[in-house]
Amino acid sequence: MLLSKLVDLIKSGESKFIKANIFENIDIENAASIDIALKNQISFLEENNILKDNLGKTSASAIITSNNNEILGLLESLNISNIVVENPRIAFAEVLNFLYEEINFNPGIDDSAVIKSSAKVGKNCYVGPNVYIGENSIIGDNNKIFPGTTILGNVRLGNNNVIHPNCVIYENTSIENNCVINSNTVIGSEGFGFIPQDGKWIKMPQKGCVIIKSFVEIGTNCCIDRPSVGNTFIDEGTKMDNLVQIGHGVKIGKNCAFAAQVGIAGGAVIGNSVILAGQVGVNNRVKVGNNVIASSKCGIHCDIEDGEVVSGFPAMKNKSWLRSSSVFKKLPELAKKLRQLDKK
């Protein structure tokens, strides 16, 4: 694709185009990281990018960058064409979509798929080999359901969703539109509900459901459980990494982002635009406010107010955690001094 064509496409995107300086309208074949990019490749560079030192050594034919005079001056001296936008990362994401077309799966239902007679599949859907769709399930239009996926009874799947291979969607689950569910994820399995009595565990039936709104993306090997009654709810725009566990009856707001190995226990309520870093744990029935950020391995045992940044186990305000951490490594020395004082 000619560089000028890419510029036109970026102009129509969401990265907030500023200007383009094209020294040669070269054909861009693909994209690469700035430290390994070659001729006919495009890359991107942000102001705080740790790869900025590689700029003088790159062979990239074009760079997407921000409106930074130092970077633009260096690019001009190196005769490297550049596209200037407010958000280079978004522009680069759009370029990847332009340059690398998805493998096209023609609409149709594979002969090996099993679709129960009361189930309905909409227009322009791809249903791959060995897919199972249960009784009374309704599949909307333009969905891609990849091989080995099991969709049990009374499921509602909206339009334009992608369900990758070997997912399991349990009965009564509802997934709206434009969602992506990656491989081996299980949605709507039984919540972990047992009642202790006389030294044994009595099972609490899990008869609720899972509701997932539009534009949600869920990574591989995630588990989203249904509750005994009511629903587990994930609002629109939320994104989950791999190996995330969502317990029964959890409510998650809009546009949240959860990194790998996050675990949220039953009944917790997560607000909008919450960021949970890797291995964060959230306790039962805890309420986490809007715009909260929790750093990795954080243990959230009590409610967190809107806008807080928390760290540590148990979670505390990040500034308090940093102060505590600085003291922690001095504890052996402090303990030694205390023993010496005791002897006096």
UniProtKB/Swiss-Prot annotation:
InterPro entries: Hexapep, LpxD, Trimer_LpxA-like_sf, UDP_GlcNAc_AcTrfase_non-rep
Gene Ontology molecular-function annotations: N-acyltransferase activity; structural constituent of carboxysome shell
EC category: transferase
Keyword entries, A-Z: Acyltransferase, Lipid A biosynthesis, Lipid biosynthesis, Lipid metabolism, Repeat, Transferase
Reaction catalysed by this enzyme: a UDP-3-O-[(3R)-3-hydroxyacyl]-alpha-D-glucosamine + a (3R)-hydroxyacyl-[ACP] = a UDP-2-N,3-O-bis[(3R)-3-hydroxyacyl]-alpha-D-glucosamine + holo-[ACP] + H(+)
Pathway: Bacterial outer membrane biogenesis; LPS lipid A biosynthesis
Catalytic residues in the record: H248
Domain of life: Bacteria
EC code: 2.3.1.191
Subunit details: Homotrimer.
Name of the molecule in the record: UDP-3-O-acylglucosamine N-acyltransferase
Organism: Prochlorococcus marinus subsp. pastoris (strain CCMP1986 / NIES-2087 / MED4)
Upper classification of the organism: Bacteria, Bacillati, Cyanobacteriota, Cyanophyceae, Synechococcales
